[in-house]
Curated annotation (Swiss-Prot):
It comes from Neisseria meningitidis serogroup A / serotype 4A (strain DSM 15465 / Z2491). This is Adhesin MafA 1. The keyword Signal applies. The gene is mafA1. It is a lipid-anchor. The keyword Acetylation does not apply. Residues 1-18 form the signal peptide.
Length: 320
């Protein structure tokens, strides 16, 4: 009865041990990106921007204000990827019966003594303490078998998060301007705009997963872009577009069997869960909107898109 219970318990321990997914929490970047990561980051950004509903801005001249969460950093995975070797080691040895026979040499000593007409004869038999011959016989067959599994664990993750990469911000801003242009919406400077459009990029990075389940293994790289946007009419301070959220995830996955392969590689993009907190349910105090528009960071105003607080202030005061 105990043996019947022990077998499934041992089998379950073997199957479940070292099975899991290690998920780092890196920001993308930190050195030269490889092509797959570039493709995923660009795809998620393009999908999020392309899905923006801008119909309410048709025929208007808009000024864009884009703020991006810090997204540059570095990360590395070390260790992991088990190999069938020897951590759980069992050994069975079947040894044959062995018999050894020894033959020791013997020698005889004779001594004769004569004294006063008396003669004595002494004879002794001795055996040397070293065999002159040994014979070993083995009966039956012998065998030896072993089984082992070496598990390197799921590895160690190290990451470093830095500041926003200006080139990433520039790329994302150019995507936004491209979509606005293709939708027939004019993007102009704040001095010539009748509408302000604010875009907050909350998530713009990658996630790497490693899954180890003995027979099945997988490496997964995901890129996510999550943004919230809204538009304000400068004349009456009304919201032309209430706060809306777009979130997309692009993924690249390699499937392995015993870490041999990959036997399958897949790529895809899909909408993902939105922001943990958004502003879609915020209502103004009273019956009027505020007189001041949100501002963006000064270091986000470069190359003709996005404007600093000082530029917005001068425009509202009528200064050049």
């Amino acid at each position: 009865m105990q043996a019947r219970l022990l077998i499934p318990i041992l089998f379950s321990v073997f199957i479940l041990s070292a099975c899991g997914t290690l998920t780092g929490i890196p920001s993308h970047g930190g050195g030269k990106r490889f092509a797959v990561e570039q493709e995923l980051v660009a795809a998620s950004a393009r999908a999020a921007v392309k899905d923006m509903d801008l119909q309410a801005l048709h025929g208007r001249k808009v000024a864009l204000y884009i703020a991006t969460m810090g997204d540059q950093g570095s990360g590395s995975l070390t260790g992991g990827r088990y190999s069938i070797d020897a951590l759980i080691r069992g050994e069975y040895i079947n040894s044959p019966a062995v018999r050894t026979d020894y033959t020791y040499p013997r020698y005889e000593t004779t001594a004769e003594t004569t004294s006063g007409g008396l003669t004595g004869l002494t004879t002794s038999l001795s055996t040397l303490n070293a065999p002159a011959l040994s014979r070993t016989q083995s009966d039956g067959s012998g065998s030896k078998s072993s089984l082992g599994l070496n598990i390197g664990g799921m590895g160690d993750y190290r990451n470093e998060t830095l500041t926003t990469n200006p080139r990433d911000t520039a790329f994302l801003s150019h995507l936004v301007q491209t979509v606005f242009f293709l939708r027939g919406i004019d993007v102009v400077s704040p001095a010539n705009a009748d509408t302000d459009v604010f875009i907050n990029i909350d998530v713009f990075g990658t996630i790497r997963n490693r899954t180890e389940m003995h027979l099945y293994n997988a490496e997964t790289l995901k890129a996510q872009t999550k943004l919230e946007y809204f538009a304000v009419d400068r004349t009456n301070k009304k919201l032309l577009i209430k706060p809306k959220t777009n979130a997309f995830e692009a993924a690249y996955k390699e499937n392995y069997a015993l870490w041999m392969g990959p036997y399958k590689v897949s790529k895809g993009i899909k909408p993902t869960e939105g922001l943990m907190v958004d502003f879609s349910d915020i209502q103004p105090y009273g019956n009027h909107m505020g007189n001041s528009a949100p501002s963006v960071e000064a270091d986000n105003s470069h190359e003709g898109y996005g404007y600093s607080d000082e530029a917005v202030r001068r425009h509202r005061q009528g200064q050049p």
